[in-house]
Amino acid sequence: MNLKKIIRQKIFKPYSLRYEKSKNKIIKANIDLIPNGKILDLGGNTGERMKSLFPNKTEGIYITDISEKALDVAKNHNGYNTILLDESGNIPFEDKYFDLVFSNSVIEHVTVDKNQVYNITSTKTFKEQSLARQSRFAEEIKRVGKKYFVQTPYKHFIVESHLWFPSLYLYLPRKIQIKLIRFLNKFWIKRTSPDFSLLTINDFKGLFSEAKIIKEKSFFLTKSLIAIKN
């Protein structure tokens, strides 16, 4: 086993598992989960989060993602309804169709077209275009969900979770960020694409002004932000 695998399995994986269990506790403590309700998991990948929250329920749960491969597992292995989304952020359901909309570490990726990620090197342009799409995505969540739970990593936490790297690099001009990510992807313990735009507390409150905002802590510091409407 090489050093990168050892670090991932011995340090980051146990930390991530503890963090996910903590997040499930927050969900159960703040959302009145309806056993027979309709639930939408936006960016739900293979559906593992829903399986951990509702181990005996598949009916009425919809998993959406932009990955056909992930949705194939969600449908054929885990038994969920699946919807393939495009990158626009539009959700193809009528108003208040779902009793609960769930989104975990997704909205920060609702930014620009994936094929333009490396081409947009202006920090201002990327932020403005990203925030416009994130705003539309947030409005869609509020439109289709009676209740919602939306989580996103906090921009000013000490470690940037997509790269597992000190978050100071986020304050560099985007052009340099892209070069740094390309360089680190050659050997670093975690690879990523510069397709994400992390949110500040004010950004997040602006997107979900009607919601209760929870600051999820790690080592006494705010690690992620959660918007809850119950």
Language-model region placement:
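Class I SAM-dependent methyltransferase Rossmann-like catalytic core
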Residues: 1-32
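Class I SAM-dependent methyltransferase SAM/SAH-binding core
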Residues: 40, 45-90
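A conserved beta-strand element that flanks and buttresses the S-adenosyl-L-methionine
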Residues: 102
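Short catalytic micro-motifs in class I SAM-dependent methyltransferases
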Residues: 105-109
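A short, conserved alpha-helix within the catalytic core of class I
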Residues: 110-142
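Conserved class I S-adenosyl-L-methionine
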Residues: 114, 133, 140, 147-175
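Short alpha-helix
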Residues: 190-210
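Core SAM-dependent methyltransferase catalytic element
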Residues: 213-230
